[in-house]
Amino acid sequence: MRIVLITGISGSGKSVALNALEDAGYYCVDNLPPHVLPELARYLAHEGQNRLAVAIDARSSASLDEMPGLIRALSHEHDVRVLFLNASTQALIQRFSETRRRHPLSGSPSHDADVGLLVSLEEAIERERELVAPLAEFGHQIDTSNLRANVLRTWVKRFIEQKNDDLVLMFESFGFKRGVPLDADFMFDVRALPNPYYDHELRPLTGLDQPVVAFLDALPVVHQMLDDIETFLVKWLPHFREDNRSYLTVAIGCTGGQHRSVFLAETLAARLSRQASVIVRHRDAPVAVDASSRLVT
């Protein structure tokens, strides 16, 4: 049986991930007490069900200490995958504020001032981080701080499609002026390359548009940087596989995240698509929603 365990921080998108798995044909259970999982897996296997997805959060805190051993035991009989979702505290506070929902560890509703509520929520978030931290090492980690729901569904789809020993390589373009991606394993600064922004005809375009592609593709220095990054990644990917890494994020940054970083992320994704399962995402470029994150095949 394929068992997908979804865990991480409340507000980071576990419900979105669970719904995506339900759409993919998984039998889904939210907030299942961990000690019940082996019995449920046996029952569903007996009933002919071969795909199970379970969301586990800090409300099961009394049983969280059992999870590492439980995951190891289940892995002897089943194909077990752990998806660990995280997000910045700022993003989580904003999401809870927008949805007007209480954090599961925040206790009873308070009638204090807004600042007091935020402090209480922040404390609950940090407490939950401590509780679920031991599970992070087992999981395929995704930082959802800047992800749209449809992008997260795309990533979950790739996660369940990949072979168990496969490596997912995610190229993310971004702009330094909007901050660096906190979940990047490698970060390459390409601001030294000529900037199409200073060409008035290219300024409103992105690195996905052919005129910008032609501009950058004609520059030898761009290809030198592409070759150097590709050589580095090809050399070290086997070592990450040997270390049982399932996911690697490579961030490519320019000033605004619109031209150079987008072009390099796209080009590197195409070049490395035979080396690993590849996703490309453009965090800051003003591109269509369906182009902001996609699978590369």
From Swiss-Prot:
Keyword annotations for this protein, in alphabetical order, are: ATP-binding, GTP-binding, Nucleotide-binding
Q: Which SUPFAM superfamilies match?
A: P-loop containing nucleoside triphosphate hydrolases (SSF52540)
At which positions is GTP bound? D57, A58, R59, S60
Give the domain of life: Bacteria
The protein's matches in Pfam families, at most eight in alphabetical order, are given as: PapZ_C, RapZ-like_N
Q: Which PANTHER family match?
A: RNASE ADAPTER PROTEIN RAPZ
Its recorded name reads: Nucleotide-binding protein BMA3112
Q: Please name the source species.
A: Burkholderia mallei (strain ATCC 23344)
Its taxonomic placement starts with: Bacteria, Pseudomonadati, Pseudomonadota, Betaproteobacteria, Burkholderiales
